[in-house]
Amino acid sequence: MKSTVPEKLAPELAVSKWFNTKQPLTLEELRGKIVILHAFQMLCPGCVSHGTPQAEKLHQMFSGDDLRVIGLHTVFEHHAAMTPVSLEAFIHEYRLTFPIGVDEAGKDGDIPVTMERYGMRGTPSFVVIDRDGVICHH
């Protein structure tokens, strides 16, 4: 697959809370695997109808293989409605089984840390990270 971005090492994830994993995940620990990072918001219609179901399907199709799907709940609007408690209910309701992290709030409260590090412009966003930890599609 031809890269759609200049070769760049993927920035580490800044996560305040994890769901569907017993321990926090780091990209460093996932080196050697292909990582699909799915950034979403619970109240994003495109995330609910397309992005998140696609991420779950990838996770189910390739679990145990050399591909890991990681969800990143990145809240840049409607902050009061998108709490970790609400996210936990969302994960249960939609039967999501892939690991999901809550992106750390940004300094000014608008753009979350990981979203800013990756230059994401909205949700849903998918980032593909190769086995060497390099972003190969954004």
Regions found by a protein language model. Give the residues of each.
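N-terminal "domain-start" segment that seeds a small globular fold
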Residues: M1-E28
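Proline-centered helix-kink/hinge sites
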Residues: P11, P45-G46, P53, P99, ...
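Short active-site neighborhood of thiol/selenol oxidoreductases, capturing the structured segment around
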Residues: L25-G51, A55, V69
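Loop/turn elements at helix/coil->beta-strand transitions in domains of secreted/extracellular proteins
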Residues: G32-V35, D65-R68, R95-P99, R131
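Hydrophobic/aromatic beta-strand patches that form the interior of the parallel beta-sheet core
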Residues: L37, I70-L72, G101, V127
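Structural microenvironment flanking redox-active thiols in thiol-disulfide oxidoreductases
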Residues: S49-Y94, A105-P112
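Thiol/disulfide oxidoreductase modules built on the thioredoxin-like
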Residues: Y94-L96, V102-H138
